Amino acid sequence: MFQLYGFSAADAVQYAQAIFLHETSLAFVSKSRTELRDPQANYNKMTLKQFCENYPNIPLEALANGEGIKSEYMQELIVGQPAFFAAYDKLSAAENASVLKALMLWSVIRSSSAYLTDEIREANFDFFGKTMSGRQEDYPLWKRATNQVENQMGEALGRIYCKKFFPESSKKMMETLVKNLQISLGERIDAQTWMSDVTKAAAHKKLDKFYVKIGYPNKWTDYSLLNIDPSKSYYENVLACRKFANDKEIAEKAGKPVDRDEWYMTPQTVNAYYNPTTNEICFPAGILQYPFFDPKADEAFNYGAIGVVIGHEMTHGFDDQGRQYDATGNLQDWWTADDAKGFNQRADMYADFFSNIKVLPDLNGNGRFTLGENLADHGGLMVAFNALKNVTAKKPLKNKDGFTPAQRFFLAYAGVWGQNITEKEIRQRVKNDPHALGKWRVDGALPHIDAWYEAFGVKPGDKMFIPKNERLELW
């Protein structure tokens, strides 16, 4: 890559070696992705003065001021990895100017390689796409262009998307679904015999205070200050977009209270999230389409597809990470010691189960890393199926296409997790993705759901059968 940017072969080798040694040194003192899932261990408060005293070779204040962030806005900091900063501080003091120059050059190269010549872009894809992920070819030009518009002006595109694909009737249906799932999760909380009344009461308080976002934000981003100039290069316009986003972030957040109406995904994103620090659940319009949601389908389909997604995000508020935050999003313990012990014992069983799954002949899953997502998948299934029973109790659904309502619920769930994935990508995801692979979000979750056995008549000797006393349950 350095040579493609005009550097000599000798300089390219020298820079590459320096960068590799530097980043390897930092990798050895970085927490693993599993360790980063512990909110308490990664919540280390210190003042700006303490930070500067602890790490004198990291000019944090000067860097922040250079970005337009005043020192008065950063007098209190949360340092996720003190050991990393300690090592980086020592490394910065020891590095010579040529290494620091190489690092800065590489930062520019990596951040610009997708926006310059085809030769540079293809070299970037050869490594990150082919070598790291096993992809055979890059996205076509139309998709790369569309993705770029989405990345830089996501809400402008989202506003058009919602007008065309997300009617008000769909939003109202989702509001009803969310309400029914909240009722169901409350019932599941009450049903846990291992949990004390005092902790259940706190759980209900948190559940009742969920801030729900559906479809699109209440206020749209104003892009009037963003100037896209056709006379300038593609990369120059990308930089203009980045500067606009950076300036906007600082202007709206530095020294300001948290904006609970801010969205962390664009409306057209096919995803959903739970944010523990604001106790909010968000379902963008992009995921409120088939095969997750169909306004013309019956409850069996919608509760099995988007219903489980809703239950999944709600359960995140009570998984191994989310349970450590209270109803207002503060990192605060609201569990009795016995209840916390009971939770951890059950959660450990999930971690062990998914760690024993062979995703490839020579590779097991990482149940500890994927614990929160696996708990949310199982909880989402339990909560959504219970909600389906509630809403159809007085008016049972009929069989359709030869399948019972219960069967169609589970088929709808399984249908959203089909994947066409390379072996290289599997290996990457096991290391880097906190979700289990799509196959195991189905085959690893359903064998622990009693209703699934009843729906399909699964019996001893069948491939996915697990004895009842070995099935896991938390929510």
Please place each PLM-identified region on the residue numbering.
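Noncatalytic, helix-rich "gating/capping" subdomain that lines the substrate-entry/channel surface
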Residues: M1-N180
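Zinc-dependent metallohydrolase catalytic domains
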Residues: E175-G307, H316-W475
